[in-house]
């Protein structure tokens, strides 16, 4: 046990961060005004500005937001003891729209609106995760979920408000990230070794993942990606 603890300590000491940026190549189609929110008698009043779709979040120097980065070949573990991740229903939208969690990690769904929502989870046909559909009234207690099986872009929707979607990627290790609005990301404290890092966006590259081989040392590693607007 002492030797195992020493080895774990040495590994933690030599762990490094993976940093990088995802850039979008090409011009995405214009985002559309969400007329369903605009014309809804309750949800429309929750927004002072026009609400548009957000399929492509493009920031400084064509940095692409909402890209999920995962690490293949990393040691698998459960996220049961990890801090919960929050998915809010605010302004009749799921916030954030894209997020990632670890298997076993708690996902806490809130309703910050003054209107009824229902949290409808629709897993892939062969994913192994279970469908769920739970109503959540204004001021109702948070609803907590956890998922046992990895899945890419697990769908959350609201049947009351058909424009509401979120997409949750479930990962079997703690080494993942979602790019910010400028395309930047960091995966922290990765054990030293060789890995395959994968970048995936729901729309860019036709939704297909792009991979790179990297080696992480105590100095970390860099992985930049360019994803394309489908032609």
Enumerate the language-model features and the residues they cover.
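Extracytoplasmic copper-binding redox domains, predominantly the cupredoxin/blue-copper superfamily
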Residues: 13-231
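Bacterial N-terminal signal peptides
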Residues: 1-9
């Amino acid at each position: 046990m002492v030797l195992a603890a020493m080895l774990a300590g040495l590994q933690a000491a030599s762990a490094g961060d993976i940093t990088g940026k995802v850039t979008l190549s090409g011009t995405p189609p214009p985002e559309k005004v969400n007329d369903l929110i605009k014309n809804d008698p309750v949800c429309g009043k929750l927004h002072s500005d026009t609400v548009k779709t957000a399929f492509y979040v493009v920031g400084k120097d064509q940095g692409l937001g909402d890209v999920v980065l995962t690490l293949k070949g990393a040691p698998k573990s459960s996220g049961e003891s990890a801090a919960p991740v929050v998915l809010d229903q605010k302004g009749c939208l799921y916030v954030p729209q894209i997020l990632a969690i670890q298997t076993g990690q708690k996902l806490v769904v809130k309703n910050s609106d003054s209107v009824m929502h229902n949290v409808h989870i629709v897993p892939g046909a062969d994913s192994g995760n279970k469908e769920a559909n739970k109503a959540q009234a204004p001021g109702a207690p948070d609803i907590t979920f956890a998922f046992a099986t990895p899945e890419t872009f697990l769908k959350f929707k609201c049947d009351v408000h058909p424009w509401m979607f979120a997409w949750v990627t479930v990962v079997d290790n703690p080494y993942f990230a979602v790019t910010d609005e400028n395309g930047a990301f960091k995966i922290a404290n990765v054990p030293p070794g060789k890995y395959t890092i994968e970048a995936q966006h729901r729309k860019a590259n036709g939704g297909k993942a792009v991979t790179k081989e990297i080696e992480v040392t105590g100095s970390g590693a860099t992985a930049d990606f360019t994803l394309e607007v489908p032609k």
